[in-house]
From Swiss-Prot:
GO terms for biological process: threonine biosynthetic process. This is Homoserine kinase. It comes from Halothermothrix orenii (strain H 168 / OCM 544 / DSM 9562). The lineage of its organism: Bacteria, Bacillati, Bacillota, Clostridia, Halanaerobiales. The gene is thrB. Keywords: Amino-acid biosynthesis, ATP-binding, Cytoplasm, Kinase, Nucleotide-binding, Threonine biosynthesis, Transferase. Pathway: Amino-acid biosynthesis; L-threonine biosynthesis; L-threonine from L-aspartate: step 4/5.
C-alpha cells in the first residue's frame, strides 16, 4: 500500500495568466492497495463530511490518467483499490483536476515498476491538463513560473518561505475553466499587455524577495480577472473587504470562483469579512486559512507493482 499526497494550487496568479502558479497547504490524498481479486475499486472520501462517494470508473479523472499510462505500456490493470481523500473543493479554481491527473499518472507509474522519471510524467500531465500552471506547482511545490515552447516545458521554482498566510474564500457554486475561457477577449490593447507583463515580473520578484507589502500592486491584472469576475457576483466587494481588513494581496484563484487573499498574520478577520461580502449577494461561502507549500507531491508507504513483486 502506498499513498500519494498532492497540494492544491492557485494558478493564473494575479497577472500571471497560464504562467504563474502557487502551491498551498491543502491536500488530496490517493491511497493505492493491492487486491487479491481482479477488481478495480475506486472510492472518494470527502474530508469535510466523511462521506464516501463511488463514481462510475469512466467518470473518474484519476482513473483516466492511470489508464493513459497503462495503455501506453499495453498493460491491463487488475486488483487495485484506490481511496481518494478529497480536501480540495472541485471546480473552484484550486487545482483539483491537477491532483487527480498527477495521482493517476504517478500511481500507475509505480505499479508499472517506475519506467518513467518525474520530469517525463510531468510532461504527460501538462499534456492532459492542457496548461502547466497547476500541475507544475502541485508536483514541485512553491511559487512556479512556467513557459511552454510548443510541447517543451520550462519552469523555475521559487521557495517563498512559510511566513505568508493564505485565506481562501470559496463560494458554494462551481465554475468550469472551459466555460470561463469563453469570456476572455480574443485581443487586448498594447497598453494592457505592458500593464500585465510588468506586474508579472514584479510579482515574481515579490515572491523571490518575500516582499509582501508590494503584493497589492503586483497582483493587479488586465488579462482575465476583470472578464471572469463578471460571472462572480460580489467579486469587487469581496476583494475590497479583504483589503479593508488587512490583506496584503487579493486575486481570483485559478479561473475562480475562489478568491485568494494573503496576509502577514492570522487571517480570520479577513476570511469572515469576505464571507460576509459574498453574503450581501445571497451567495453562501466558507473560508479556509492555510499556508504555502514548498514540497509538492509526496509519496509514502510500500510500493507494489502489478506483476506481484512489491518493493
Amino acid at each position: 500500500m502506498f499513498t500519494i499526497k498532492i497540494p492544491a494550487t492557485s494558478a493564473n496568479l494575479g497577472p500571471g495568466f497560464d504562467s504563474l502558479g502557487l502551491s498551498l497547504q491543502l491536500y488530496n490524498k490517493f491511497t493505492f492497495k493491492r487486491l487479491k481479486s481482479s477488481d478495480i475499486r475506486i472510492k472518494i472520501k470527502e474530508v469535510d463530511t466523511g462521506n464516501i462517494i463511488e463514481l462510475p470508473i469512466k467518470d473518474n479523472l484519476i482513473y483516466r490518467a492511470m489508464m493513459y499510462l497503462f495503455e501506453r505500456y499495453d498493460v491491463r490493470p487488475e486488483g487495485i483499490e484506490l481511496m481518494e481523500e478529497v480536501a480540495i473543493p472541485f471546480a473552484r479554481g484550486l487545482g483539483s483536476s491537477a491532483t487527480a491527473i498527477l495521482g493517476g499518472l504517478f500511481g500507475a507509474n509505480i505499479m508499472l515498476g517506475e519506467p518513467l522519471e518525474d520530469e517525463e510524467l510531468l510532461k504527460i500531465a501538462v499534456k492532459l491538463e492542457k496548461h502547466p500552471d497547476n500541475v507544475v506547482p502541485a508536483l514541485k511545490g512553491g511559487f512556479v513560473i512556467n513557459v511552454l515552447k510548443g510541447s517543451d516545458l520550462y519552469y523555475k521554482k521559487i521557495n517563498p518561505g512559510e511566513q505568508l498566510r493564505v485565506i481562501l474564500c470559496i463560494p458554494e457554486f462551481q465554475l468550469k475553466t472551459e466555460d470561463l475561457r469563453q469570456v476572455l477577449p480574443r485581443q487586448i490593447e498594447f497598453k494592457d499587455a505592458v500593464f500585465n507583463h510588468s506586474r508579472t515580473a514584479f510579482l515574481t520578484s515579490c515572491f523571490y524577495e518575500r516582499d509582501w507589502e508590494s503584493l497589492r500592486v503586483a497582483m493587479q491584472d488586465r488579462l482575465h480577472q476583470d472578464y471572469r469576475s463578471s460571472l462572480i457576483p460580489g467579486f469587487d466587494e469581496v476583494v475590497k473587504s479583504a483589503y479593508d481588513n488587512g490583506a496584503v494581496g487579493v486575486a481570483l484563484s485559478g479561473a475562480g470562483p475562489t478568491v485568494i487573499s494573503f496576509a502577514k498574520d492570522k487571517g480570520d478577520k479577513i476570511g469572515e469579512a469576505m464571507v460576509k461580502a459574498f453574503g450581501h449577494y445571497n451567495i453562501n461561502s466558507k473560508y479556509i486559512e492555510t499556508g504555502l507549500d514548498n514540497k509538492g507531491l509526496i509519496l509514502k508507504g510500500h510500493k507494489f507493482s502489478l506483476s506481484g513483486g512489491s518493493r
